[in-house]
């Protein structure tokens, strides 16, 4: 089963629409806050059930699936974001530890395609995450990466409009 997490609702919808031709309706799920809270809960319940039954499904979602949703996928693809979101996304892959190997891939989408500039702080978080990842070695040390990320993020935000929040 695959989970794809993107930074904008518009891009989630666009990818979902593209994937519809490759999946049966029952195997492809769309999750964003464009759905009502009730519909989201219903879909998340169905996704959990299908995953527990071992069904192969694909979920295209915004970050809403990252926190507080206990799901376990074989493969996670995450659009570059802040390290906190990346770590949350990684927590949705092989969560139960039943697989010998499982993978989380980070993708850095074109700015013109993703259009995150209107989302407060996302571009700064992406820049800091990319810098921390570029500095890392082949063996990923999540603790070290997270420290690098926050160091880069705070350095980027220093003197910026967000410095009061930091």
Set out the residue ranges of the language-model regions:
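Conserved ATPase-coupling elements of RecA-like P-loop NTPase cores
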Residues: 69-73
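Short amphipathic alpha-helical segments, especially helix-boundary/capping motifs
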Residues: 20-23, 63-67
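Conserved two-lobed SF2 helicase motor
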Residues: 50-66
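C-terminal helicase lobe and adjacent C-terminal extensions/tails of nucleic-acid helicase motors
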Residues: 1-5, 10, 14-41, 48-49, ...
């Amino acid at each position: 089963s695959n989970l794809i997490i993107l930074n904008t609702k518009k891009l989630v919808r666009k990818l979902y629409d593209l994937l519809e031709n490759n999946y049966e309706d029952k195997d492809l799920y769309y999750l964003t806050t464009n759905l009502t809270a009730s519909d989201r809960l219903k879909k998340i319940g169905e996704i959990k059930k299908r995953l527990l039954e071992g069904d192969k499904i694909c979920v295209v979602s915004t970050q809403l699936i990252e926190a507080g949703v206990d799901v376990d996928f074989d493969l996670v693809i995450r659009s570059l974001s802040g390290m906190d979101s990346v770590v949350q996304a990684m927590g949705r892959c092989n969560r139960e530890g039943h697989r010998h190997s499982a993978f989380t891939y980070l993708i850095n989408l074109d700015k013109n395609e993703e259009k995150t500039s209107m989302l407060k702080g996302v571009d700064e978080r992406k820049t800091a995450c990319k810098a921390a990842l570029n500095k890392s070695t082949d063996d990923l040390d999540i603790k070290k990466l997270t420290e690098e990320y926050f160091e880069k993020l705070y350095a980027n935000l220093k003197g910026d409009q967000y410095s009061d929040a930091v």
